[in-house]
């Protein structure tokens, strides 16, 4: 069984994240969306709310699980017995960073990282932008997956 984690803060989960998960499902049997807890990061939504939003989005898909974790991503991958880490790439800067982390993860644990490039129309979408729009009470519906409720 091919199992992957898709790690991130997901504050909030965007259509870009959704696209990565949907594309990864074409070659993975199970994907665990791992919501990393970083005490040094100020988040817009509490961890419980992020878990709830994503879990509700995938409630009818038994191949998707949602979990939070507060350790190194590679340790989380080993804990859940994932063979792969899936990451989304929007820019060259993202690629350079993820390539380095992928090399370290392979050396430390033998876990491969699969990099999926964002579709061109989604490269401008980020959780940071969505949070900024939320701060100013703007409509974010075009930037989050259909059916995901943010309130």
Swiss-Prot record:
The record marks 17 as: Transition state stabilizer. One of its GO terms (cellular component) is cytoplasm. It holds the Pfam family CTP_transf_like. The keyword Cytoplasm applies. Substrate binds at residues 9, 41, 73, 87. InterPro entries: Cyt_trans-like, PPAT, Rossmann-like_a/b/a_fold. Keywords: ATP-binding, Coenzyme A biosynthesis, Cytoplasm, Magnesium, Nucleotide-binding, Nucleotidyltransferase, Transferase. It is found in: Cytoplasm. Pathway: Cofactor biosynthesis; coenzyme A biosynthesis; CoA from (R)-pantothenate: step 4/5. Its EC number is 2.7.7.3. Its main location: cytoplasm. It catalyses: (R)-4'-phosphopantetheine + ATP + H(+) = 3'-dephospho-CoA + diphosphate. GO terms for molecular function: ATP binding; pantetheine-phosphate adenylyltransferase activity. Its cofactor is Mg(2+). Belongs to the bacterial CoaD family. Reversibly transfers an adenylyl group from ATP to 4'-phosphopantetheine, yielding dephospho-CoA (dPCoA) and pyrophosphate. Homohexamer. This is Phosphopantetheine adenylyltransferase. It comes from Bacteroides thetaiotaomicron (strain ATCC 29148 / DSM 2079 / JCM 5827 / CCUG 10774 / NCTC 10582 / VPI-5482 / E50). The gene is coaD.
């Amino acid at each position: 069984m091919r199992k992957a984690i898709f790690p991130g803060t997901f504050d909030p989960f965007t259509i870009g994240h959704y696209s990565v998960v949907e594309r990864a499902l074409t070659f993975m049997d199970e994907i665990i969306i791992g919501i990393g807890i970083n005490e040094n990061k100020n988040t817009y939504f509490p961890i419980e709310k992020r878990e709830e939003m994503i879990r509700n989005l995938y409630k009818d898909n038994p191949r998707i699980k949602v979990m939070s974790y507060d350790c190194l991503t590679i340790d989380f991958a080993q804990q859940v017995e994932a063979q792969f880490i899936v990451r989304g790439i929007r820019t060259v800067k993202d690629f350079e960073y993820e390539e380095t982390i992928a090399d370290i993860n392979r050396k430390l644990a033998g876990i491969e990282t699969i990099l999926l490039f964002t579709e061109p129309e989604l490269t401008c979408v980020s959780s940071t932008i969505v949070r900024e729009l939320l701060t100013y009470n703007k409509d974010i519906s075009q930037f989050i997956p259909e059916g995901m409720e943010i309130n």
